[in-house]
């Protein structure tokens, strides 16, 4: 019988860097996490995962089976470099090919959710044409994901195009497809001028996972928990009362820290204490 406890995961980039997934999942298990979210970012090293051999993919699956720690989601931020909204046809084609490979990879190793970055373009100036291309590229991507039974979920971003659940819901309603959903980041959501609790309630029924991090206005990464503007307890209470029972993912970038495991353990305890205050988990 499946446990009724809240699934709590950790982002790959919070743990020591490297390509040994057995070691990474063993560490995550030691730290008390249920799952790890894989990163496929714009670096050549992480992009190369999409070209893993059958044996490399099987090694990941075996590590999951051996440890009991799942890898149910992928953070696909490679589209910063190869955006679906690019006005350069070659770059956009690369972006669509990355999407195709990511969906195939997910299908092969059991990843259920691919979190998408809501940028039409990142390093270029946006305009109406980049947004049209982005929307059309997403439509094509959702069609691919539907055939593979892999969910594409839009992150709430550090970027105006997708900085609220309301904006992401516009795309969800436009596509009207069960394989396109939302993956809000309560840190990003709180850093903008949003009514955070109303936004979270508006997304219920479309939220498949939640990123947990702290932020400040204009500062979206590496804000220590408790030093930013996020009202974690209220966010957790709102999600619980709205009926959300899905996973939470602590997002950190401590892979190059002197002691990543210690940093992660500290963050885990801090987040779980706020969850306990919100009535989501038992107090330690």
Curated annotation (Swiss-Prot):
Task of the protein: Catalyzes the isomerization of L-xylulose-5-phosphate to L-ribulose-5-phosphate. Is involved in the anaerobic L-ascorbate utilization.
Pfam families, per the entry: AP_endonuc_2
Induction: Induced by L-ascorbate. Repressed by UlaR.
Organism classification: Bacteria, Pseudomonadati, Pseudomonadota, Gammaproteobacteria, Enterobacterales
NCBIfam families (alphabetical): hxl6Piso_put, PRK13209.1, PRK13210.1
EC number: 5.1.3.22
Molecular function via GO: intramolecular oxidoreductase activity, interconverting aldoses and ketoses; L-ribulose-5-phosphate 3-epimerase activity
Keywords tagged on the record: Isomerase
UniProt xrefs under SUPFAM superfamilies: Xylose isomerase-like
Family: Belongs to the L-ribulose-5-phosphate 3-epimerase family.
InterPro entries recorded: L-Ru-5P_3-Epase, L-Ru-5P_3-Epase_Enterobacteria, Sugar_Epim/Isomerase, Xyl_isomerase-like_sf, Xyl_isomerase-like_TIM-brl
GO BP terms: L-ascorbic acid catabolic process
UniProt source species: Escherichia coli O1:K1 / APEC
Protein's UniProt name: L-ribulose-5-phosphate 3-epimerase UlaE
Gene: ulaE
């Amino acid at each position: 019988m499946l446990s009724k406890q809240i699934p709590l995961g950790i982002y790959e980039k919070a743990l020591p860097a490297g390509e040994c997934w057995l070691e990474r999942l063993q560490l995550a298990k030691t730290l008390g996490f249920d799952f790890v979210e894989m990163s496929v970012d714009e670096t050549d090293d992480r992009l190369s995962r999409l070209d893993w051999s059958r044996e490399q993919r099987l090694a990941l699956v075996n590590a999951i089976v051996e440890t009991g720690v799942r890898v149910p989601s992928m953070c696909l931020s490679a589209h910063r470099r190869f955006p679906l909204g690019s006005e350069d046809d070659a770059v956009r084609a690369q972006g669509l090919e990355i999407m195709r490979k990511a969906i195939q990879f997910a299908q092969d190793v059991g990843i259920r959710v691919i979190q998408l970055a809501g940028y039409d373009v990142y390093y270029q100036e946006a305009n109406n044409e980049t947004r049209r291309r982005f929307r059309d590229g997403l439509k094509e991507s959702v069609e691919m994901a539907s055939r593979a039974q892999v969910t594409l979920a839009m992150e709430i971003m550090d970027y105006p195009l997708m900085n609220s659940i309301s904006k992401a819901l516009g795309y969800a309603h436009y596509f009207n497809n069960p394989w396109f959903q939302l993956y809000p980041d309560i840190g990003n959501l709180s850093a903008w001028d949003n009514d955070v609790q109303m936004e979270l309630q508006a997304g219920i029924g479309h939220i498949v996972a939640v990123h947990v991090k702290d932020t400040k206005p204009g500062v979206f990464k590496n804000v220590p928990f408790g030093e930013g503007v996020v009202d974690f307890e209220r966010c957790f209470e709102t999600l619980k009362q709205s009926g959300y029972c899905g996973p939470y993912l602590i997002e950190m970038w401590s892979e190059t820290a002197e002691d990543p495991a210690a940093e992660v353990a500290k963050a885990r305890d801090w987040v779980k204490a706020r969850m306990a205050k919100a009535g989501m988990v038992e107090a330690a």
